[in-house]
């Protein structure tokens, strides 16, 4: 099974401009690296709180099965543009929570693509992301060992412990 998730870096919360304001940067010379730091900080926060924080385009390619659990889905994400192809042909489907039931006859291979949207990221989560991205900017070498304490404290109320 192949799973791919491409983050829409231009719709992140907080934005690149928020990070530049936080760091008091007024020119565009650091934008490329700041975007990498911001994306990394968002993913770090996602891992800490077990919640999707980034608008994304997702794709799954796998052998046929009539029921697929969509990765990266959670209670705060909204799903749009879901498309299911079985052996290259579009299929109808039914969404049940984060599971997709495929209608029609069995096939060999299937591909599922969808967009995940995040409507709202709380202010304290955004602040934690800004602090983490700022730490990446301040320490471009591999010296930062852990999350900044302030970031940990801001994310702690949102941490969800999941069992698998």
For the regions a protein language model found, what residue spans apply to each?
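Divalent metal-cofactor coordination and adjacent catalytic microenvironments
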Residues: 1-164
């Amino acid at each position: 099974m192949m799973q791919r998730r491409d983050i829409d870096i231009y719709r992140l919360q907080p934005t690149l401009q928020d990070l530049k304001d936080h760091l008091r940067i007024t020119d565009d010379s650091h934008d490329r690296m700041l975007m990498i730091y911001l994306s990394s900080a968002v993913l770090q926060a996602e891992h800490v709180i077990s919640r999707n924080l980034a608008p994304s385009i997702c794709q799954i390619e796998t052998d046929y099965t009539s029921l697929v659990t969509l990765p990266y889905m959670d209670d705060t994400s909204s799903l749009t543009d879901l498309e299911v192809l079985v052996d290259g042909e579009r299929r109808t489907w039914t969404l049940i929570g984060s599971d997709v039931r495929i209608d029609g006859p069995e096939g060999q291979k299937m591909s599922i693509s969808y967009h995940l949207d995040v409507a709202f990221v709380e202010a304290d989560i955004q602040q934690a992301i800004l602090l983490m991205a700022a730490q990446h900017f301040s320490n471009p070498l591999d010296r930062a060992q852990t999350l900044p304490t302030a970031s940990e404290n801001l994310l702690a109320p949102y941490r969800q412990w999941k069992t698998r």
